């Protein structure tokens, strides 16, 4: 049986909810990156033993969170020894906006996987782009590179008024 690890960072809990669903569907172990961008003890060993690594992060300012990027930069050690070569990779992300530049985050994950000589697996779920489609339909956002979700926020403190 294959061993799958879902490594993710979650800023406000939305990505954690996605990670839990992904892990349940893939019969995978969860590996959370903490608020300082670090893995828990034994985390690197979990990834070394995995056959597949599924990466998740919120999309902030058009890319993965800095905590995920810190993890990615630290993965240069397994890169140097080619420890993740031929592993299967996939990814998921979310943002508050309908678009939110989530594809940029998935491209970031893809590039990281390719640098590790991995094999990328996208989504085979057809987009729900019919007139009858609803926002909760599978693949409403139409992504083939990986899973995308829109995470609603309750309130924003941003003031978009512009005084000239």
Question: Which residues fall in each region the model found?
Answer:
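Soluble or luminal CAZymes and related metallo-dependent hydrolases
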Residues: 67, 101, 105, 163-164
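Short, glycine-/small-residue-rich phosphate/pyrophosphate-handling segment
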Residues: 88-140
């Amino acid at each position: 049986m294959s061993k799958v690890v879902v490594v993710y960072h979650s800023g406000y809990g939305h990505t954690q909810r996605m990670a839990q669903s992904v892990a349940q569907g893939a019969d995978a172990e969860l590996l959370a990156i903490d608020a300082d961008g670090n893995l828990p003890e034994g985390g690197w060993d979990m990834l070394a033993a995995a056959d597949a690594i599924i990466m998740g992060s919120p999309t902030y300012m058009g890319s993965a969170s800095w905590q995920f990027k810190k993890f990615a930069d630290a993965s240069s050690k397994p890169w140097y020894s080619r420890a993740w070569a031929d592993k299967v990779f996939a990814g998921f992300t979310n943002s508050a906006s309908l678009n939110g530049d989530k594809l940029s985050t998935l491209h970031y994950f893809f590039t990281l996987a390719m640098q590790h000589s991995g094999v990328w697996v996208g989504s085979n779920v057809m987009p729900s782009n019919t007139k009858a489609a609803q926002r909760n339909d599978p693949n409403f956002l139409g992504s083939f590179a990986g899973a995308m979700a829109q995470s609603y926020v309750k309130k924003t403190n941003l003031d978009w008024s512009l005084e000239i």
